[in-house]
UniProtKB/Swiss-Prot annotation:
This is UvrABC system protein B. A motif (Beta-hairpin) lies at residues 101-124. ATP binds at residues 48-55. The gene is uvrB. The keyword Lipid biosynthesis does not apply. It comes from Micrococcus luteus (strain ATCC 4698 / DSM 20030 / JCM 1464 / CCM 169 / CCUG 5858 / IAM 1056 / NBRC 3333 / NCIMB 9278 / NCTC 2665 / VKM Ac-2230) (Micrococcus lysodeikticus). It is found in: Cytoplasm.
Amino acid sequence: MSLAQKINRVVAPFEVISPYQPSGDQPKAIAELAERVEAGEKDVVLMGATGTGKSATTAWLVERLQRPTLVMVQNKTLAAQLANEFRELLPNNAVEYFVSYYDYYQPEAYVPQTDTFIEKDSSINEEVERLRHSATNALLTRRDVIVVATVSCIYGLGTPEEYIEQMVTLRRGAEMDRDVLLRRFVQMQYVRNDVDFHRGTFRVRGDTVEIIPMYEELAVRIEFFGDEIESIQTLHPLTGQVVREEEEMYIFPASHYVAGDERMGRAITTIEDELRERLQELESQDKLLEAQRLRMRTTYDLEMMQQMGYCNGIENYSRHIDGRPAGSAPHCLLDYFPDDFLLVVDESHVTIPQIGAMYEGDMSRKRTLVEHGFRLPSAMDNRPLKWDEFLERIGQTVYLSATPGAYELGQADGYVEQIIRPTGLVDPQVVVKPTEGQIDDLLEQIRVRTAKDERVLVTTLTKRMAEDLTDYLLEAGVKVEYLHSDVDTLRRVELLRELRKGTFDVLVGINLLREGLDLPEVSLVAILDADKEGFLRSTTSLIQTIGRAARNVSGEVHMYAGNVTDSMRRAIEETERRRAVQIAYNEEHGIDPQPLRKRIADITDQLAREDADTADFLKGMGGVKSGFDFGMGHRGLSSLDRAPATGEGAAAPAVDPASLPAKDLADLIEQMSQQMHQAAADLQFELAARLRDEVGELKKELRQMKREQ
């Protein structure tokens, strides 16, 4: 079955909307990347220095190529930041976010040494789950899609064919029995709930059926006249206000692992066959305990599947449900993309090794479970893709990195370089200093920087050294904080914001290579024990660390070392080469490097400013609360989801601000501001961003009301 035959894809052009035009090295890089891709080169590398605008270059490249794009990123937080950047640059296109939906995940495991079985335990983030469904929905219904994803995209997912087969197509004026539609919704794993109406449920009131698809925040109302669909409306689930009328709509299943009755029946039969074979094998080896354990667990799962259509851990039976042969690769997000999609690997020197490492780590745990009777052997086929399977599923690939790895450089025919920064900022000067008296020298340099209201990053090799250095600097009267692995993700971002604000002046850490540490206020990066060869002091790591000072006009890097290693020499030579290129460009074009004023690449910095603005604003309005409870709950009134393909912007607000009294509107602003902070605390950066935007619109409306009074 062709996906195109089943669904009418919306075709709209990618269009970058930005007040800026490509500058510096960007025009040359965009043109050369596009030429290489259009010429059919399979692998292309963009070596882009820190601060040269690689994300914007990617957006302009996608606009030129007009192809669905998957952008792979190394972790969730960076994926959220990059998705926000793309949404700003491509507001009329579908920019999706696909990462693991677990806030907490403890996979099931068995420790033979202590005879300890650890049950699977997890906490699912509902908003991230919605965004995952939104990504697959967008890929199947339109062409102008960019999905920003972590390596979660190579883990097993239901087949797109079955996902589409279970889909319901609604058309105004079409003949459809209401009860048949309700049964279809149940088969798609939606739950009827006439009281608590939320995402993944539907309710029925006479000839009116309402459902909130898993990938939407708004509800869909289907009104029948006999067996004819009289109208299809998108509406706000709380207020009931109609947002728009629909002529046609697709409702996709509530789970990526949904299967029809026929497919589930076949799966149950093949699971029973495998169980019999495995029990015979275990009993022939006198593993009676393992055989009994496997019989009990699998029989229970089979009963659940027969009665309910699913069971806990149903993904472990995905090979049977998909009808795949033993040892075959699982379906994953890559299978939802059209054949001509473009893959962009961000920070490829980190992301590529991640992809290759996923399979073995997962397999060693599952192998133990199978050997001791906790799972059937087919559970090992619920896994991430192997490296060669990943390569089979991708087409043309663009690798982005300031320090591309050996693999990328080996695959590509040379590389495209992007060194020149539009701002004119030059790579920092690198100074090598002796280790003798390094702490006293560092303390003196810190005092020089703090006197100028500048910030300092210090990177050490060990946790103990970082802790001791932090204590020493505190005793010396330096305002310092220590960034370590025990600090959770949101607190890390808060530390960066506090560093920028001047709450403290020095940040000490071990691995300060993360992209979130691009801080314009940092004028000095100190690298202790720079001559200790290893992962943290390799050429790649040193260049990445040097880049942390590349956002400041007077940036410097001090390497404390007893001798200059090969890694140090290569890193220094590359930095000097890039400095020379930028300086020559500045002189030729008469550019005077300007200090960079850049927000932290995350939503929390905006939230802090928004919070202060909202507090002042409401205070100015008299701080009167009406007591009106909008009852928005966790989801809020956010309607700024993916912009429609028509390019007309976001959906109309679900609540018309003009219809509310000023006091109620002020109360709504305060409630939504609280939800904005809660969303950020839950790492739901996309939801927080949408709430932030809506708060801004509501404040404009309230200011207008105030002027008219």
